[in-house]
């Protein structure tokens, strides 16, 4: 039987929305690459940058599909997935910084990603805290 408790439902819904967001990001990074680079990320459309952006689009399509799959087939773990997302990106950012790489472009997508991470963290904390309260009352 599927868990329909409020924390699970909230986490599932947020993961579902993020899945759709990632699919849209994947389509933009993969199929409208130059337009997205110039108009959204505001980075120079250098061929190497576009190649990396396109490859990142592939991973966006993958994560979007996996988030949707979890939301529909394994809703009980949706909250944990939301906790893993910012940790994975943080590890990636640490690796980038350790290699001395820094952005030179405006990269306006960072504001959307900040909201993305805050939503993940707030929902994960709610999922864990509400889940613990529920288990104490049972």
Outline where the language-model segments fall.
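Core segments of alpha-helical transmembrane spans in multipass integral membrane proteins
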Residues: 20, 47-68
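Membrane-water interface at the C-terminal end of transmembrane alpha helices
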Residues: 117-138
């Amino acid at each position: 039987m599927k868990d329909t408790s409020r924390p699970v439902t909230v986490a599932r819904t947020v993961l579902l929305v993020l899945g759709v967001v990632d699919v849209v990001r994947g389509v933009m990074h993969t199929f409208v690459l130059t337009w997205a680079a110039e108009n959204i990320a505001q980075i120079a459309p250098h061929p190497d940058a576009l190649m990396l952006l396109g490859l990142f689009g592939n991973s966006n399509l993958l994560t979007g599909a996996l988030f949707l799959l979890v939301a529909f087939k394994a809703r009980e773990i949706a909250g944990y997935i939301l906790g893993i997302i910012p940790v994975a990106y943080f590890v990636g950012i640490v690796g980038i910084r350790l290699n001395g790489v820094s952005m030179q472009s405006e990269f306006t997508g960072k504001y959307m990603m900040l909201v993305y991470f805050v939503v993940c963290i707030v929902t994960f904390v709610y999922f864990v805290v509400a889940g613990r309260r529920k288990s104490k009352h049972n």
